[in-house]
């Protein structure tokens, strides 16, 4: 299974700039932050905020609080808008496994998978 989104906004921040509900995250100088159009209304739970998402094989930490329709990540460098982001699955040799994520938040992997809402488009691929 592969659960992906894409970068919808990318910005280089200044020291002290804040993002997210309640200005929960304060950026460092020169940090690249990106917005993804996925949030808890899509089933990407708020308690998954401590996870890393995968961008071209880089583990990118979620910053701030997962919002209703979006979340933000820190990037190691600038990436273009539209760059694919892997929430669950494999990306350039790195893997985000729902069972591993579930252990960190005190649940099971199936709860993460079953929580993905109907707002998220699905593509079914026959690998045979």
Task: Report each predicted region and the residues it spans.
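Active-site anion/phosphate-binding pocket segments in diverse small-molecule metabolic enzymes
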Residues: 1-128
């Amino acid at each position: 299974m592969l659960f992906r989104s894409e970068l919808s906004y990318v910005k280089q921040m200044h020291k002290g700039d804040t993002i997210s509900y309640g200005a929960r995250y304060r950026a460092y100088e020169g940090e690249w932050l990106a917005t993804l159009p996925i949030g808890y209304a899509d089933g990407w739970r708020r308690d998954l905020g401590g996870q890393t998402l995968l961008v071209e094989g880089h583990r990118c930490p979620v910053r701030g609080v997962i919002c209703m329709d979006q979340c933000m990540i820190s990037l190691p460098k600038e990436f273009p808008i539209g760059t694919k982001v892997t929430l669950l699955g494999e990306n350039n040799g790195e893997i985000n496994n729902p069972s591993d994520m579930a252990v960190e938040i005190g649940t099971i992997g199936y709860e993460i998978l079953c929580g993905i809402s109907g707002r998220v488009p699905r593509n079914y691929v026959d690998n045979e």
